Amino acid sequence: MEKALKIDTPQQGSIQDINHRVWVLQDQTLIAVPRKDRMSPVTIALISCRHVETLEKDRGNPIYLGLNGLNLCLMCAKVGDQPTLQLKEKDIMDLYNQPEPVKSFLFYHSQSGRNSTFESVAFPGWFIAVSSEGGCPLILTQELGKANTTDFGLTMLF
């Protein structure tokens, strides 16, 4: 089997939901707020997992998601009976260079037209979401297209 080319740096992008809310970092928590002047949305760092052969096929591109320049990465962990989305201090390149996938930090990125979804690899069927209210922390949900928004626009920066 052919080895994938090694990547030195993650790609960068910005994310907003269908209501034009962007992700911002507030007290070590990611929240979605309406885009305004003089606001600084986070720049997302993302990089594909090098070990796709060990993951489910046809679910999307397995990626690590972090905050560019901040050594913070998104991860999923069970708190009580519920999977939760958390920010953990971690260098995204350290995750990328691990000898095996670090599933708690991986998301299946699926694209349909301009919309992207991010499904937890550790908790299949759970997706990154924002409350339709806005101004709330990002969460994980199993309920697509209901009270929470799971479709995002991902714009890659070059």
From Swiss-Prot:
Expressed in immune system and fetal brain, but not in other tissues tested or in multiple hematopoietic cell lines. Predominantly expressed in skin keratinocytes but not in fibroblasts, endothelial cells or melanocytes. Increased in lesional psoriasis skin. Induction: By Il-1 and TNF-alpha. It is found in: Cytoplasm; Secreted. SUPFAM superfamilies: Cytokine. Cytokine that binds to and signals through the IL1RL2/IL-36R receptor which in turn activates NF-kappa-B and MAPK signaling pathways in target cells linked to a pro-inflammatory response. Part of the IL-36 signaling system that is thought to be present in epithelial barriers and to take part in local inflammatory response; similar to the IL-1 system with which it shares the coreceptor IL1RAP. Seems to be involved in skin inflammatory response by acting on keratinocytes, dendritic cells and indirectly on T-cells to drive tissue infiltration, cell maturation and cell proliferation. Transmembrane segments: none annotated. Keywords: Cytokine, Cytoplasm, Immunity, Inflammatory response, Innate immunity, Nitration, Secreted. Interacts with TMED10; the interaction mediates the translocation from the cytoplasm into the ERGIC (endoplasmic reticulum-Golgi intermediate compartment) and thereby secretion. The modification 3'-nitrotyrosine is found at residue 96. Belongs to the IL-1 family. One of its GO terms (biological process) is inflammatory response. The gene is IL36A. Its main location: cytoplasm. This is Interleukin-36 alpha. N-terminal truncation leads to a dramatic enhancement of its activity (>1000-fold). InterPro entries: IL-1_fam, IL1/FGF. One of its GO terms (cellular component) is extracellular region.
